[in-house]
């Protein structure tokens, strides 16, 4: 039963699919239960509220980022909420201005405080979007905030803390693209949010950074997509960066349809597991894709999970027993237009558990984290339990 809370030009390597290590379209069965649902909750007010990301804190707490139109927001604000292990709200902080602003990603700085990434139109005098970066204390106090952009739109992708206390931010830029399309935008900040350096990466068409994580070997991994034709088709894209934001290696892989990576998580050996969606590889429409690369950029396995319609991975994390849990959306299964789609994979990418959560309308998972007690919390959006949209949260153990 769900409870409602009222508080509330680039060098890359193109890989032929025949060179892929263990590229598999998986026929799904019904694996034995691996996770149990602890609780499901929705949080929201009188208008749309959507959760996009989550990060683990101490004592079972978590911090969630999203976009809120409720809670006395202006048009829409970046919304950061700290929740307890049982899903209660400790505090909520709204960030932004008088225009439309969106929260995209959240992580922790070296000193343990919260790093916030969003984008919005409140940070300049025109109607264009800028990147927004902020640092909050663990009790929700604003330490600093900065915005970055030009005379066109910028789009937020991912954020990570650095060894020196600084911040790496990735996203997309139209302002600083030489070709008139989106280029990947990488910004390095010091511990006080001051810009140290920035650079763009791109080809002749759109290039997008969707997510960023720190790897176990102290570097960073960025994932996204590179457009391959003017019809909008794209390839999976990955780039490993060092602490100075310089490229260690990059990979582009895909076929003749739309392939994109939305999220990435580190593995203990310095590699990564990434998830997204594909319309290639004999997909019937759009399927959920998951892949594992080692620290040197070698593709170890690549799995595709999907049914007749639309299935997509939006978030991924490692579980306490060394498996991986992917969260996303599906309209191939379930009761509504879209439902939350959760899959557990073993270290070799084999499906060991899956479950669909949702009701009659749209329920979509956007973020996932492992908590300090080893549980899993998934966040996203729902308009199945009331209109308009609310934060939707699921805790598993």
What are these regions (language model features)?
Residues 22-397:
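A sequence-level/structural motif corresponding to short, flexible coil/turn segments enriched
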Residues 4, 20-21:
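Short, flexible coil/linker elements and helix-boundary hinge sites characteristic
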Residues 10-17:
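Bacterial N-terminal signal peptides
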Residues 1-9:
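Bacterial N-terminal signal peptides that target proteins for export
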């Amino acid at each position: 039963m769900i409870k409602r809370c009222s508080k509330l030009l680039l060098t890359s390597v193109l890989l032929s699919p025949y060179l892929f290590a263990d590229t598999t379209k998986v026929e799904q069965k019904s694996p034995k239960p691996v996770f149990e649902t602890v609780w499901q909750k929705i949080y929201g007010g009188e208008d749309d509220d959507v959760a996009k990301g989550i990060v683990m804190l101490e004592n079972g707490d978590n911090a969630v980022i999203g976009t809120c139109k409720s809670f006395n927001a202006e048009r829409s604000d970046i919304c950061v909420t700290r929740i307890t292990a049982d899903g209660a709200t400790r505090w909520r902080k709204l960030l932004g201005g008088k225009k439309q602003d969106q929260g995209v990603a959240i992580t922790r700085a070296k000193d343990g405080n919260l790093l916030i990434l969003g984008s919005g139109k409140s940070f300049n005098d025109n109607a264009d979007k800028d990147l927004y970066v902020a640092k909050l204390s663990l009790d929700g106090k604003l330490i600093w905030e900065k915005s970055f952009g030009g005379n066109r739109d910028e789009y937020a992708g991912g954020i990570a803390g650095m060894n020196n206390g600084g911040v790496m931010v990735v996203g997309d830029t139209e302002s600083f693209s030489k070709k008139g399309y989106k280029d990947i935008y990488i910004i390095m900040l010091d511990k006080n949010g001051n810009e140290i350096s920035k650079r763009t990466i791109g080809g002749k068409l759109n290039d997008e950074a969707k997510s960023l994580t720190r790897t176990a070997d102290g570097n960073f991994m960025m994932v996204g997509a590179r457009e391959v034709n003017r019809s909008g088709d794209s390839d999976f894209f990955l780039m490993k960066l060092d602490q100075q934001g310089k490229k260690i290696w990059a990979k582009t892989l895909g076929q003749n349809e739309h392939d994109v990576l939305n999220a990435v998580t580190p593995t203990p050996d310095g590699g990564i597991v990434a998830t997204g969606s594909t319309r290639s590889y004999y997909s019937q429409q759009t399927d959920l894709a998951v892949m594992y690369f080692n620290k040197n950029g070698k593709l170890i396995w690549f799995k595709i999970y999907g049914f007749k319609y639309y299935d997509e991975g939006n978030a991924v994390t490692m579980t306490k027993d060394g498996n991986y849990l992917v969260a996303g959306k599906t309209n191939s299964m379930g009761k509504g237009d879209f439902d939350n789609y959760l899959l557990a994979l073993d270290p070799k990418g084999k499906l060991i558990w899956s479950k669909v959560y949702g009701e009659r309308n749209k329920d979509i998972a956007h973020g996932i984290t492992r908590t300090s007690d080893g549980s899993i919390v998934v966040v996203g959006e729902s308009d199945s339990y009331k209109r308009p949209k609310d934060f939707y949260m699921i805790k598993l153990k």
